[in-house]
Amino acid sequence: MNFETVIGLEVHVELNTNSKIFSPTSAHFGNDQNANTNVIDWSFPGVLPVLNKGVVDAGIKAALALNMDIHKKMHFDRKNYFYPDNPKAYQISQFDEPIGYNGWIEVKLEDGTTKKIGIERAHLEEDAGKNTHGTDGYSYVDLNRQGVPLIEIVSEADMRSPEEAYAYLTALKEVIQYAGISDVKMEEGSMRVDANISLRPYGQEKFGTKTELKNLNSFSNVRKGLEYEIQRQAEILRSGGQIRQETRRYDEANKTTILMRVKEGAADYRYFPEPDLPLFEISDEWIEEMRTELPEFPKERRARYVSDLGLSDYDANQLTANKVTSDFFEKAVALGGDAKQVSNWLQGEVAQFLNAEGKTLEQIELTPENLVEMITIIEDGTISSKIAKKVFVHLAKNGGGAREYVEKAGMVQISDPAILIPIIHQVFADNEAAVADFKSGKRNADKAFTGFLMKATKGQANPQVALKLLAQELAKLKEN
């Protein structure tokens, strides 16, 4: 029997506000344990939460970017549960009236087709703290993350393969990043994914029993975890067994899923309206203000890069996959850089350098200004493409002006015949055996002189000019 796969994804995204959702404490990642905390995060008696307006701004932008309807009458709810990293014993979230609902996003699949994936809801909530288990037998609680603002985006169960789930996450990450509401860095926990997956016989409308997958710390692991789970569930069903409603985690080392707990029924969190936060309304004016702050999104940028700048679909997709790269490209072209040349550098030498150094574009000293200047001095013959690679590495590590560095480092390309011809004559004098081979008509003997000349000029000879002059002087040599 063959089965149809049904997948839905729950994505938690940390919003990039300066402070937390209900307290003035910094929401920045990477500080010492419990450095970003105060009495609200610790849940001291008598303290009251105050809603951060910037969080609602971000929620409105997310809803608009994901084509969602917006609940204008807003309130928060208490989700009651006990865990050491949750000192209040409840989480402030949104239950029956999320900020956004009934949305969709269009994704591009591997075969080039597109599919619209429904988004059931997007709700605002606070993050919990973090438990760490020490080798000394103690467990420690870090509340830096407690109260960091989240938006949870819940898709419809519209995906039918791990590939579609991967495409959905890629598109969602792009939209959220372009909207400017999160850096969506999975390695820092600012984007976290849970997957719900079930199988059903083809033609059956009723969903099968679902399994929830956790510990999916990369898009690649989402795909691998789903692929394994499809295989596991299919084997159980084909052998006459039944799927239990479980929560499982993906084991990256063994590429399997491991049981965490069995769900006997839906968890009862005893939701009720948050009494410490007043109701409020999102006005049409507020929504329109947020709409005007939204940028051009990847789909529109890709189309413009192809139609206006003459880039290929591939180049347009590569450049817009990351907003930082795309914004860098935009500025470089606005400064007069040739679109294709800028694209080639960003996808070639720049990407290789970033991979080798383990850095992002924001973490190096290359700027649109000095990249465009470097491309300009390649085009005007000041430096060769070979020398440009060395210049680029210097700019990436140290910044500064490309032309200034080239001149100070003595890298300016030699194009003057008055300088090159004497060097060519010296090459002949220094390589008598090669001259004899050439005069005797030995095959390809002339090729050696190209290398001799480039070595003599330390690679600074303009290749086009040098080859023309070399051919001219070799012809004279043969006549003598």
Curated annotation (Swiss-Prot):
UniProt cross-references to Pfam families, sorted A to Z: GatB_N (PF02934), GatB_Yqey (PF02637)
Keyword flag Coiled coil: no
Disulphide bonds in the chain: none
GO BP, sorted A to Z: glutaminyl-tRNAGln biosynthesis via transamidation; translation
The EC number(s) this enzyme carries: 6.3.5.-
Coiled coil residues, start to end: none
Top-level enzyme category: ligase
Catalyses which reaction(s): L-glutamyl-tRNA(Gln) + L-glutamine + ATP + H2O = L-glutaminyl-tRNA(Gln) + L-glutamate + ADP + phosphate + H(+); L-aspartyl-tRNA(Asn) + L-glutamine + ATP + H2O = L-asparaginyl-tRNA(Asn) + L-glutamate + ADP + phosphate + 2 H(+)
MF-aspect GO terms: asparaginyl-tRNA synthase (glutamine-hydrolyzing) activity; ATP binding; glutaminyl-tRNA synthase (glutamine-hydrolyzing) activity
Keywords of this entry: ATP-binding, Ligase, Nucleotide-binding, Protein biosynthesis
Similarity field: Belongs to the GatB/GatE family. GatB subfamily.
Quaternary structure and interacting proteins, as annotated: Heterotrimer of A, B and C subunits.
Protein's job: Allows the formation of correctly charged Asn-tRNA(Asn) or Gln-tRNA(Gln) through the transamidation of misacylated Asp-tRNA(Asn) or Glu-tRNA(Gln) in organisms which lack either or both of asparaginyl-tRNA or glutaminyl-tRNA synthetases. The reaction takes place in the presence of glutamine and ATP through an activated phospho-Asp-tRNA(Asn) or phospho-Glu-tRNA(Gln).
Protein name per Swiss-Prot or TrEMBL: Aspartyl/glutamyl-tRNA(Asn/Gln) amidotransferase subunit B
